[in-house]
Amino acid sequence: MRSVYPHDQVFGEYCTVNDYVDCPPDELYEYMADTRSLEEWTYSLRGFTPTDEPGLWLAHDRLGSETKIYTRTIANEQARTVDYHCAWDQGKHLWMIYLMRVIDAQVVLDKPGSVVLWTNCHHPFYDENPYPESAPPQRPVWVGDFWDMFGAGHLLELKTLKAIAEYRHRNGLPVTPKWMR
């Protein structure tokens, strides 16, 4: 037994966060299934605009200066899975996959609401940019430089998602705002 463990021994190839959200699962799923919701609850993704390719969105990731991020959301309503397929700098190979699932809390916790499970896998591209020619030349960081902070960062984002959904639900507002409809 040790008093301190290296990040890799604790988290390894996966980063998983989860939380209870006091919001009906179908409403939370519908909100999350819209790619533009990421602009509200993530730390750094802003300015989503559709691309010429149906279902593919372009935004700016403020973690990297002048960084474009491409996102396609693959959602399954019946299973309530929402997977965000993303990549910095180019939209042809979306290799950063954010796997999310919204579970009916009544089934697993015997109370109304949702449980959100979120997992990222440490893709080899986190270690080295596979498309350096697409990167802005002045950018000093690569998304993989932040891997050790994914757990803390994603938990913060999940807490933001929770706060938004719970506030809207508690106040009788649509969880998915009108501007997204």
Predicted features by range, described:
Residues D26-Y29, L155, K159:
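Amphipathic alpha-helical segments that line or abut small-molecule/effector binding pockets
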Residues D89-L156, A163, G172:
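Beta-strand/loop substructures that line and gate deep hydrophobic ligand-binding cavities in soluble
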Residues M1-E53:
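Hydrophobic ligand-binding cavity/cleft-lining segments
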Residues C23-P25, E77, A105-V108:
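Short loop segments at secondary-structure junctions
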Residues N171-R181:
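Charge-rich (especially acidic), low-complexity segments
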Residues E39-Y43, T49-I97, L109-D110, V116, ...:
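Glycine-rich portal/gate segments that line the openings of hydrophobic small-molecule binding cavities
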